[in-house]
């Protein structure tokens, strides 16, 4: 069972599957629905998770308090249910953004990191983050793997504590979602069943309404040939899995891409 999941900084929310009736509802808002989040991935071993909303008890009109408390809010949000999930996929090597590794200071475009390489450092140090970006960005993450969705969601929440994030496992739903919601950036896995990240990127770039939408690939496929193909189909940037880059580098790259797209 595939779920659409949404995180809103002011009201915790999630999205159920798009049924035929929901698809026909032109007024659907993916940031306003409020059922609980589920991590059901057709596995009896995965339990149902419900998020708590650390922002519900705050005065939404007090921006100064929000600014002062963003560290606390971010910390609370990063206590992610992913930490309690037993990962049974023995070949999955995609590390938590909060797990310290040797920090990569080069561009993700120029530095391809093997998931089988020695990423773990003996002298562990956490990823640094100079200052979170408090812009209310809207992000869409598309990945058929629930664990990968959760990890990228955690990275983005640490970089952008006030962002609104929709997570989608079923790539066939992306077309309908893009017709109904605006996003500042879409993060795509490349290898997905039925509709790939390449297919989604081509669809986005074929519609001039989405010219200001950044498209970022997050994938293990980062050969020179792959990167050239991504560029040709309109993908703005590529991050390699696992995301063991400094948070400042990831955030700076995303900010630059969004700014460049909005200037078109």
From Swiss-Prot:
Q: Which SMART domains match?
A: REC
Q: Name one Pfam family in it.
A: Response_reg
| Top-level taxon | Eukaryota
Where is this chain compositionally biased, Acidic residues type? 62-74
- At which residues is 4-aspartylphosphate found? 189
- What region holds the Response regulatory domain? 138-256
Task: Enumerate the Gene3D superfamilies for this protein.
Answer: 3.40.50.2300
> What GO terms in the biological process aspect are recorded for it?
filamentous growth of a population of unicellular organisms in response to biotic stimulus; phosphorelay signal transduction system; positive regulation of filamentous growth of a population of unicellular organisms in response to biotic stimulus
**Biological role:** Required for stress adaptation, morphogenesis and virulence.
The name on file for this protein is Stress response regulator protein 1
The top of its lineage is: Eukaryota, Fungi, Dikarya, Ascomycota, Saccharomycotina
Q: Which gene encodes it?
A: SRR1
């Amino acid at each position: 069972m595939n779920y659409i999941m949404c995180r809103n900084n002011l009201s915790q929310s999630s999205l159920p599957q798009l049924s035929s009736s929901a698809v026909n509802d032109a007024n659907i808002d993916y940031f306003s629905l409020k059922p609980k989040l589920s991590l059901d991935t057709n596995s009896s071993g995965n339990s149902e998770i419900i998020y708590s909303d650390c922002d519900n008890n705050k005065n939404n009109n007090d921006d100064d308090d929000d600014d002062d408390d963003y560290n606390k809010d971010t910390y609370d949000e990063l206590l992610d249910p992913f930490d309690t999930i037993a990962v049974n996929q023995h070949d999955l090597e995609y590390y938590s953004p909060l797990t310290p590794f040797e920090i990569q200071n080069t561009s993700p475009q120029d530095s391809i990191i093997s998931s089988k390489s020695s990423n773990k450092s003996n002298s562990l140090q956490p990823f640094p983050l100079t200052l979170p970006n408090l812009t209310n960005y809207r992000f869409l993450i598309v990945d058929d793997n629930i664990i990968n969705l959760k990890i990228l969601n955690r990275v983005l929440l640490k970089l952008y504590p006030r962002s609104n994030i929709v997570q989608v496992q079923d790539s066939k739903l992306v077309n309908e979602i893009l017709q109904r919601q605006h996003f500042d950036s879409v993060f795509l896995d490349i290898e997905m069943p039925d509709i790939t990240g390449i297919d989604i990127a081509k669809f986005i770039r074929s519609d001039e309404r989405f010219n200001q939408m950044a498209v970022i690939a997050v994938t293990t496929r980062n050969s020179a040939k792959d990167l050239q193909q991504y560029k040709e189909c309109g993908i703005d940037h590529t991050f390699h899995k696992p995301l063991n880059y400094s948070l400042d580098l990831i955030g700076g790259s995303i900010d630059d891409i969004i700014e460049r797209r909005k200037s078109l």
